[in-house]
Amino acid sequence: MITVALPKGRIAEDTLEIFRKIFGSSFMFEDRKLILEEGNFRFLMVRNQDIPTYVTEGAADIGVVGLDVLEEHKPNVVRLLDLQIGKCKVCIGIKNEEELDFSRSELKIATKMPNITRNYFAKLAVGVKIIKLYGSIELAPLVGLSDAIVDVVETGSTMKQNGLKVAGDIMQSSAYLIANKNSFIIKKDEILELYQKIKDEISK
């Protein structure tokens, strides 16, 4: 049996749809259940940020997680495949009437992705003070907590609704299939067979 960690939300639904097309089974989580067993698979419904931990620690053989999460945490996993779902961007956001002043000695940036943020601004030789937040990132510049934010953006509508604009793109992201390193040795044939089936399905 292969254990698969999925992030709650649309990416989980899109991933299960790929499995439905490949295997012809229902692959539906019952209401509020966090574990689904179907055929040779056991699916775990997990918070997006926790997927690398489940896979790294071996609680799941494989997982589906955003590239932004992989780049932020750099987990010791095997990156197998870009699933071409959950596409988004990591962007800099600022207030509509402002521009980002890179000449300042230090910019205050609110984000839940401190590593991506720090690395990006380091390449620009811009000093930053990271304000680590876990939600409602858009609020920070509106109340003077930060000069700008770094956040995941799909359509940009949340920023617009809160009087912010995109001031720059840091990276593109989409959902990746990853594997635990030990599982990739012990269950290599099963995982590679699944990898090939998924690759064939998403390239149709």
From Swiss-Prot:
Molecular function GO terms recorded: ATP binding; ATP phosphoribosyltransferase activity
EC number(s) stated in the UniProt entry for this protein: 2.4.2.17
One Pfam family linked to the record: HisG
Biological or metabolic pathway of the protein: Amino-acid biosynthesis; L-histidine biosynthesis; L-histidine from 5-phospho-alpha-D-ribose 1-diphosphate: step 1/9
Subcellular localization: Cytoplasm
Catalysed reactions, semicolon-separated: 1-(5-phospho-beta-D-ribosyl)-ATP + diphosphate = 5-phospho-alpha-D-ribose 1-diphosphate + ATP
Entry-linked CDD domains: PBP2_HisGs (cd13595)
Role description: Catalyzes the condensation of ATP and 5-phosphoribose 1-diphosphate to form N'-(5'-phosphoribosyl)-ATP (PR-ATP). Has a crucial role in the pathway because the rate of histidine biosynthesis seems to be controlled primarily by regulation of HisG enzymatic activity.
Subunit record text: Heteromultimer composed of HisG and HisZ subunits.
Protein name: ATP phosphoribosyltransferase
Species of provenance: Campylobacter concisus (strain 13826)
Gene name per UniProt: hisG
